[in-house]
Amino acid sequence: MGDRNLTPKQFGALGEQYAAAWLEEHGWTTLSRNWHTRYGELDIVMLNPEYTVVFVEVKSRRSMHYGYPQEAITPAKQHNLRKAACDWLLDRRNRVPHTAVRFDVVTIVLRVGRPLVHHIENAF
């Protein structure tokens, strides 16, 4: 955990694995992972116990030295995530009964021992 030998891509994938597992432990169901559109990638799409489709952006860091991980989600990134989410919702393969849609952020600080997980609901 927090292994300095991981590439940035591997490190991000590890953070996404922790985030998905953490949410699944809280009763959520994974619908998609790393879903690509022309607007970018949706890290994780999940269905929570209240039947809300939640688009989860995951930000992983080794420390808080450069600020909070969620600060990396700029207004432009949020705009592209919204467009990507629309594409996901319009894709017939992703039809799932749901009552609402929202965007959450999960930050993971991978440190020695246990990862520090912070879940921000309705982040934007």
Curated annotation (Swiss-Prot):
NCBIfam families to which the protein is assigned, alphabetical: PRK12497.1-3, PRK12497.3-3, PRK14681.1, YraN family protein
The record's Pfam families line, in alphabetical order, gives: UPF0102
Protein name as it appears in the record: UPF0102 protein Blon_1698/BLIJ_1758
Family, similarity comment? Belongs to the UPF0102 family.
Any one GO MF annotation of this record:
nucleic acid binding
> What SUPFAM superfamilies does its record include?
Restriction endonuclease-like
